[in-house]
Swiss-Prot record:
Belongs to the universal ribosomal protein uS11 family. The keyword tRNA processing does not apply. Part of the 30S ribosomal subunit. Interacts with proteins S7 and S18. Binds to IF-3. Keywords: Ribonucleoprotein, Ribosomal protein, RNA-binding, rRNA-binding. Pfam families: Ribosomal_S11. This is Small ribosomal subunit protein uS11. Residues 1-33 are annotated as: Disordered. It comes from the Bacteria. The keyword Metal-binding does not apply.
Amino acid sequence: MPPAKKGPATSARKGQKTRRREKKNVPHGAAHIKSTFNNTIVTITDPQGNVIAWASSGHVGFKGSRKSTPFAAQLAAENAARKAQDHGVRKVDVFVKGPGSGRETAIRSLQAAGLEVGAISDVTPQPHNGVRPPNRRRV
């Protein structure tokens, strides 16, 4: 006997309510920009560290090596800033981490999106002679 066909996947959830995010009213926050060689992640938090909005180069729609470009970082920062402004964020302190190419571009696009940037600090972790670094590329 062939297996019974199941209905559309949405029918099981018809009666359930979807959980909407409540709008937080946070006028001052912190923007954490993690820029690696492969991607850029922008996270905007409240002063306690709870995430309000985030975006990354991959989340915006870039794939592969295009995620590491400054333009991808710019779009990710604009996207995160727009989401944060919906929650009432107007001023941010920026914390930049990592060696990637999207660091300065992301800060500039946060300002261009309408957020007032306060302090900018580099929180890239520096090893006190930790693990052995990867080999230099021979091209």
